[in-house]
Amino acid sequence: MASLRKPSNHADRACSRRLRVATRVAGRRMCRPVAATKASTAVTTDMSKRTVPTKLEEGEMPLNTYSNKAPFKAKVRSVEKITGPKATGETCHIIIETEGKIPFWEGQSYGVIPPGTKINSKGKEVPTARLYSIASSRYGDDGDGQTASLCVRRAVYVDPETGKEDPAKKGLCSNFLCDATPGTEISMTGPTGKVLLLPADANAPLICVATGTGIAPFRSFWRRCFIENVPSYKFTGLFWLFMGVGNSDAKLYDEELQAIAKAYPGQFRLDYALSREQNNRKGGKMYIQDKVEEYADEIFDLLDNGAHMYFCGLKGMMPGIQDMLERVAKEKGLNYEEWVEGLKHKNQWHVEVY
């Protein structure tokens, strides 16, 4: 997932070859870009760890606190476009004011119910939530536990014959969120999700593989690991992020990532797969599986020694990754299916795609 919107039954999240995200479309308001002179609210470059309210470390993992029938009412604080002009789509960082009343853990998701989701046979609106992975730690971007952030790609449908956008087929929830203004009320469900949680062992290496907004849960990870001072959680392992996007303008949270890489050179690694700017070893486009393959031997060794591997993003990323890993496993004399099952059994293998 991501912020992703998740499950396949969510119409505006379902990705087809003809569902594209336009960066500029005449007559439609876009996410407001932040002026060059104004600091972005979507990134933190100050790497001096900040103190956070430890009460959020207490108790059991929150799960399904709010439902479609009884959602939580939150308000949008800000919406910021975080992709550049040459990106193939528009992605927004959205900060939501929750007042700490819908707590979550890193790796979980919120449901968002957009207005006018579905009308039943009696003419009444039926609330249907779209799921988005949360892109902040449980303490929010401010570190006080009063907000949560989403990373949302605006989904629009472009007719393959005319090349024009069809407003009737645009993603309902993603456009509602990207068009929101400060103070906009949103109905939320959740939190949900157990698949992408951080391991209890703070020494375990983390290998995170993302495409697009699949980076959202991993942002919650790296902020907990490197930006926040949590007395009960001192991350000492390796954090390795592989990120696949089209080009440099499509990189998400790169300033924050570069600041972490500079502050923790021996503990944080970052590798991009830029399909429209880089070539793989065979001269073709550099996709996420190609970049991961460059370090396959090291990754297999890390997994043999207790590393956790996470995948989040478009479901189309997984076949190429699985084919590559199966080929490498065979070269190493391993049965791929048994190898993966062994990792799943030890809870080292985490996949959430949409």
Curated annotation (Swiss-Prot):
InterPro entries found in the cross-reference section: FAD-bd_FR_type, Flavoprot_Pyr_Nucl_cyt_Rdtase, FNR, FNR_nucleotide-bd, OxRdtase_FAD/NAD-bd, Riboflavin_synthase-like_b-brl
Membrane-related topology note: Peripheral membrane protein
Membrane listed as a keyword: yes
Ranges of residues in domain FAD-binding FR-type: 69-198
Compartment list: Plastid, Chloroplast stroma; Plastid, Chloroplast thylakoid membrane
GO cellular component: chloroplast stroma; chloroplast thylakoid membrane
Sites of N6,N6-dimethyllysine modification: 170
Transmembrane segments: none
GO molecular function terms listed in the Swiss-Prot or TrEMBL record: ferredoxin-NADP+ reductase activity
Listed pathway(s): Energy metabolism; photosynthesis
Top EC group: oxidoreductase
GO biological process: photosynthesis
E.C. number: 1.18.1.2
PANTHER family (alphabetical): PTHR43314
Task performed by this protein: May play a key role in regulating the relative amounts of cyclic and non-cyclic electron flow to meet the demands of the plant for ATP and reducing power.
Protein name stated in the entry: Ferredoxin--NADP reductase, chloroplastic
Annotated source species: Chlamydomonas reinhardtii (Chlamydomonas smithii)
